[in-house]
């Protein structure tokens, strides 16, 4: 079976494993976008570390969960988000201003909405987690 959206499948696996109180989850196939998205989640402490296993096929990622993640998801299609519309998107996607992050792909790489605001760049929206 061909997966149309690898990032959506990966985040759905993580969310389902978190709901079942699992400590680890296996994600396959892996992609560069999925790895960068997981790096943003690690930076903010929502998941533990992960390991990429290259099996010369699609690749696998083993993610250690720490029980802090409530929900994560992908926004499809990837809408353009200028800097002045960033507040509107964060208020629509996140439950509160105190926690949660919207992940964007920008010209400076994949980053969360706070870092994009600090660097004063807009981009396309990938997903969210809180």
Curated annotation (Swiss-Prot):
Coiled-coil ranges per UniProt: none
PROSITE patterns: RIBOSOMAL_S8
PANTHER family listed in its UniProt record: 40S RIBOSOMAL PROTEIN S15A
GO cellular component: ribonucleoprotein complex; ribosome
Name the UniProt record assigns to this protein: Small ribosomal subunit protein uS8
GO molecular function: structural constituent of ribosome
SUPFAM superfamilies: Ribosomal protein S8
Pfam families per the UniProt record, alphabetical: Ribosomal_S8
């Amino acid at each position: 079976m061909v997966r149309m959206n690898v990032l959506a499948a990966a985040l759905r696996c993580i969310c389902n494993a978190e709901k079942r109180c699992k400590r680890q989850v296996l994600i396959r196939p892996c992609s560069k976008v999925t790895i960068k998205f997981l790096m943003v989640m690690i930076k903010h402490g929502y998941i533990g570390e992960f390991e990429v296993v290259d099996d010369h096929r699609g690749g696998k990622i083993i993610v250690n969960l720490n029980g802090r993640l409530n929900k994560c998801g992908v926004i499809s299609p990837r809408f353009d988000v200028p800097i002045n519309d960033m507040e509107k998107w964060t208020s629509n996607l996140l439950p509160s201003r105190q926690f949660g992050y919207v992940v964007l792909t920008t010209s400076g790489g994949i980053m969360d909405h706070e870092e994009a605001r600090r660097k004063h760049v807009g981009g396309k929206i990938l997903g969210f987690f809180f």
